[in-house]
């Protein structure tokens, strides 16, 4: 039986209907259906046809048969690495990929090259290529604190992972065991649901031929750890708290940590783990004389022991070693460690601000590869995403350029859907460094919001970035939005009042232009709601009114934040929770 999937998209045949296409050229061929041929793929890979056809149908949701774009998917071993080539000619498209993940990424390239209209879609005869410049492109789903990744149902999580694969990302890092920080508030049903989603998530990553990496840990311990094993506290606030960390130099403490780690590894049994990542600080570390500097002494001694446990459980797994919050003392000893080891696949390097100077000034030891850790969620304002989209593409292009010459990829740290645009831009830069942030904004808009003026979209996002940071020096809650609208610089508040009003008008103009099928989608709503909220915050200098409260409640639904809101009402959590309650 042939594995052929047909998605019907209709051309309405009555007079007077104009089919609007975004950036459609004169040679663009018009279609209203797609027929996918997956005969050359394994049966377990045929779902790519459903992914591809569903994305077209969502944008051009019509219902009778007209011209059909025939698309064939196949794996071509003659292609290198994870590259793909897409040939479109005379109503037929062939997507060839070096491996299945490349086929999926190639499908994404074709989807983003199509011009979508209300009744038809079109694409000219063309040749497209997927040949990522940086080999490792991973997204880190922070599944904790009742955020979207923690609480989203399986179908939404799998859909989002599919999107990451269509963008050409090739790895996912996530938390598969229930997060210890949330366990004290969790019912047994919460843990069971989390485990079920974890299993589905891991299976989907494997089906998409992506790598799945998990935390290899550091010296963080369960809350019931023996008090006599407690680590000496960090003195640098950037490194986070380490109240629940163990000093491995205390007699009996190393054996305790190894037993805890064996238990964690046992919980991963049967899951398709292909990599692990060790982490030093935030949370982690010990400031005692035998462990300090932690990043170059206690940390590397500990992960040398851990990595053997993971090798036994997951032979050949990738090993990533983070250098988060390292100082020069950490780096000096860590470089000595790197020169004398043969097992680290990537070091993970970045900071809360600019890219660290040490690896830029000191060449990496021979054979060592570096990936960056763009902090795309938690910069410049708080709570994160609670007021709509976080879009800072220019910042992340600047950071990308700082490390472009030494990096082999990236790991994007994400706390939710609200920085989806940042994910797309940063991943796009690592795929193709010749692109710029504004180029990628236009690509995002053409695909996600067909019909809108892409240059207007670039201008719109520039204002979101320009008004993003809400820092007030010398105040207790220095990055809180609610603090900024009252105590921020008067002149800047007045300026934001004017530009945010104009930006809301621009959002409404774009919304009128874009296809009706995408106006209610969450990607547009988090951007539009940011514009609505900004306009209200700076025009009223108040955190609550009927317009704001309605916007916050819509975001609660988009973020699956209902449980997080309950926690806020009880006095805990709220890192990505819209400020629905009066006391937030």
Cite the ranges covered by each PLM segment:
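Catalytic domains of carbohydrate-active enzymes, especially glycoside hydrolases
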Residues: 155-178
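Catalytic domains of carbohydrate-active enzymes that cleave complex glycans
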Residues: 404-407, 417-419, 431-584
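Contiguous, structured surface segment used for ligand recognition
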Residues: 19-137
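Catalytic-core regions of glycoside hydrolase
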Residues: 115-120, 144, 170-172, 182-452, ...
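Second-shell loop/turn segments in exported
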Residues: 36-44, 94-97, 146-150, 188, ...
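Boundary/entry segment of secreted carbohydrate-active catalytic domains
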Residues: 28-31, 133-148, 156, 175
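Extracytoplasmic/secreted proteins, especially bacterial periplasmic and envelope-associated proteins
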Residues: 47, 51, 55, 102-105, ...
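Sec-dependent N-terminal signal peptides
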Residues: 4-14
């Amino acid at each position: 039986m042939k594995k052929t999937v047909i998605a019907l998209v209709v051309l309405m045949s009555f007079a007077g209907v104009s089919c609007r296409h975004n950036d459609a050229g004169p040679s663009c061929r018009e279609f209203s259906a797609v027929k996918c041929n997956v005969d050359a793929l394994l049966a377990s890979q045929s779902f790519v046809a459903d992914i591809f056809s569903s994305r077209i149908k969502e944008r051009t949701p019509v219902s009778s048969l007209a011209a059909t774009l025939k698309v064939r998917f196949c794996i071509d071993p003659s292609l290198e690495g994870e590259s793909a080539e897409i040939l479109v000619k005379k109503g037929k498209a062939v997507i060839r990929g070096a491996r299945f993940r490349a086929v999926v990424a190639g499908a994404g390239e074709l989807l983003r090259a199509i011009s979508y209209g209300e009744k038809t879609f079109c694409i000219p005869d063309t040749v497209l290529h997927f040949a990522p410049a940086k080999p490792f492109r991973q997204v880190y789903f922070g599944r904790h604190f009742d955020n979207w990744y923690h609480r989203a149902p399986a179908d939404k999580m799998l859909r989002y992972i599919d999107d990451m694969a269509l963008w050409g990302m090739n790895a996912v890092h996530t938390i598969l065991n229930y997060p210890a920080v949330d366990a004290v508030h969790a019912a047994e049903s919460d843990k069971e649901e989390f485990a079920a989603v974890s299993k589905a998530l891991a299976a989907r990553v494997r089906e998409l031929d992506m790598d799945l990496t998990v935390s290899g840990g550091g010296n963080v311990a369960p809350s019931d750890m023996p008090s006599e094993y407690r680590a000496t506290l960090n003195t640098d606030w950037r490194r986070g708290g380490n109240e629940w960390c163990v000093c491995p130099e205390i007699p009996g403490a190393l054996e305790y940590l190894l037993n805890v780690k064996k238990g964690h590894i046992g919980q991963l049994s049967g899951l398709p783990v292909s990599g692990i990542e060790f982490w030093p600080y935030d949370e982690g570390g010990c400031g005692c004389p035998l462990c300090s500097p932690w990043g170059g002494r206690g940390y590397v001694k500990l992960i040398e022991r851990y990595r053997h446990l993971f090798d036994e459980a997951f032979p050949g797994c990738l090993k990533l070693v983070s250098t988060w919050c390292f100082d020069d003392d950490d780096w000096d000893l860590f470089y000595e460690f790197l020169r004398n080891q043969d097992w680290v696949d990537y070091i993970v390097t970045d900071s809360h601000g600019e890219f660290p100077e040490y690896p830029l000034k000191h060449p990496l030891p021979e054979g060592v590869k570096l990936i960056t850790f763009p902090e795309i969620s938690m910069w410049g304002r708080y709570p994160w995403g609670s007021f709509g989209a976080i879009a800072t593409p220019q910042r992340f292009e600047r950071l990308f350029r700082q490390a472009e010459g030494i990096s082999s990829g990236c790991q994007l740290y994400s706390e939710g859907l609200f920085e989806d645009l940042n994910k797309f831009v940063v991943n796009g830069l690592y795929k193709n460094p010749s692109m710029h942030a504004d180029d990628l904004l236009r690509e995002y808009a053409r695909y996600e919001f067909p019909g809108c003026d892409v240059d207007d979209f670039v201008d719109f996002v520039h204002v979101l970035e320009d008004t993003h940071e809400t820092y007030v020096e010398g105040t207790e809650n220095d990055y809180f939005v609610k603090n900024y609208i009252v105590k921020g610089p008067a002149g800047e508040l007045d300026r934001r009042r004017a530009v945010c009003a104009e930006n809301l008008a621009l959002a409404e103009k774009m919304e009128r232009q874009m296809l009706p099928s995408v106006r209610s989608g969450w990607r547009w709503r988090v951007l539009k709601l940011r514009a609505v909220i900004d306009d209200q915050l700076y025009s009223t200098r108040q955190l609550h009114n009927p317009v704001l409260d309605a916007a916050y409640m819509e975001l609660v639904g988009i973020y699956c934040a209902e449980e997080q809101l309950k926690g806020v009402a009880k006095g805990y959590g709220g890192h990505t929770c819209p400020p629905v309650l009066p006391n937030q």
